[in-house]
């Protein structure tokens, strides 16, 4: 009798272990999914694209986030969709290649990382952007206060990278960048808060390129150079915030263009002129208080 009980106990134990192993194996086989809560944004210079192009763009973005190998989109739009992906979607850095299917039914996507690592990187990016938004008081600041907060955060928290080709995705996660990736991250954070932002390619007299941003504040466009702010004062000031065409020229930028090679309209509003002489600044009661040379405080109303 004891022998029979022992055999039954052994069988029961083996069955329990088998079930446990089966459950464990099953969970390991379940594909990991990304936790992405950010908006699908795009450089404002492309605002006049047809809505069907933006729809296709969002479908590809979703596919990239979930590491899907195929996505059905109208391939006739794909050149413009790619332009949006390369200029406006930081997670495009996870993609190795896009290929139009032979039957034109959509595109195939290959990736730089396997599923688990891909998901980890998507989640890390999403988490970091949310952290930056929180640090910049996105939920309580006015739009213009938020722009100042983001500019200060970027210019004081991101270091210069030795890799001039670094992308905005790596800049967010590594905390280092080039003038172009600095500008891209600045623009991305503004667009997340529904603030019109444009990527700007500047050039000096020797035709050396430099990344800048433009953004609309109270329906007027201004230029921003967060990397030069970092290089010249560690991001402590606002010297290069809210600049005009004349300000750019005084800094050695002789020409500017959008990412689509279009030429911006004249930028000449001097609302933030006091920032060119900024010694220190603070935001108080919906005002930007700029202390200029000599200790005078200039008040700029914020909306």
Question: What is each residue range found by the language model?
Answer:
Residues 221-223, 295-298:
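Short, mixed charged/polar active-site loops
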Residues 17-20:
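C-terminal motif of bacterial Sec signal peptides marking the signal peptidase cleavage site
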């Amino acid at each position: 009798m004891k022998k029979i009980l022992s055999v039954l106990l052994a069988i029961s134990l083996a069955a329990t272990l088998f079930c446990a192993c089966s459950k464990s194996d099953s969970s390991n086989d379940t594909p990991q999914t990304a936790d992405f809560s950010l908006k699908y944004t795009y450089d404002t210079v492309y605002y006049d694209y047809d809505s069907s192009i933006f729809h296709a763009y969002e479908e590809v973005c979703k596919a990239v986030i979930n590491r899907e190998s195929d996505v059905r989109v109208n391939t006739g739009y794909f050149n413009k969709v790619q332009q949006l992906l390369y200029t406006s979607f930081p997670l495009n850095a996870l993609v190795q290649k896009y290929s139009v299917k032979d039957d034109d039914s959509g595109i195939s996507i290959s990736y730089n990382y396997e599923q688990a690592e891909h998901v980890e990187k998507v989640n890390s990016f999403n988490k970091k952007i949310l952290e930056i938004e929180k640090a910049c008081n996105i939920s309580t600041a006015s739009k213009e206060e938020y722009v100042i907060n983001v500019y200060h955060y970027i210019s004081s928290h991101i270091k210069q990278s030795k890799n001039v080709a670094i992308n905005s995705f790596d800049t967010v996660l590594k905390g280092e960048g080039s003038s172009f990736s600095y500008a891209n991250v600045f623009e991305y954070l503004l667009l997340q808060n529904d603030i019109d932002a444009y990527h700007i390619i500047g050039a000096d007299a020797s035709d050396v390129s430099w990344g800048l941003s433009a953004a609309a504040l109270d329906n007027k466009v201004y230029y921003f150079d967060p990397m030069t702010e970092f290089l010249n004062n560690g991001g402590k000031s606002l010297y290069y915030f809210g600049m005009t065409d004349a300000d750019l020229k005084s800094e050695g930028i002789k020409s500017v263009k959008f990412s689509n090679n279009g030429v911006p309209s004249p930028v000449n509003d001097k609302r933030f002129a006091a920032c060119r002489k900024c010694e220190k600044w603070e935001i108080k009661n919906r005002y930007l208080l700029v202390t200029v040379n000599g200790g005078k405080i200039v008040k700029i109303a914020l909306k």
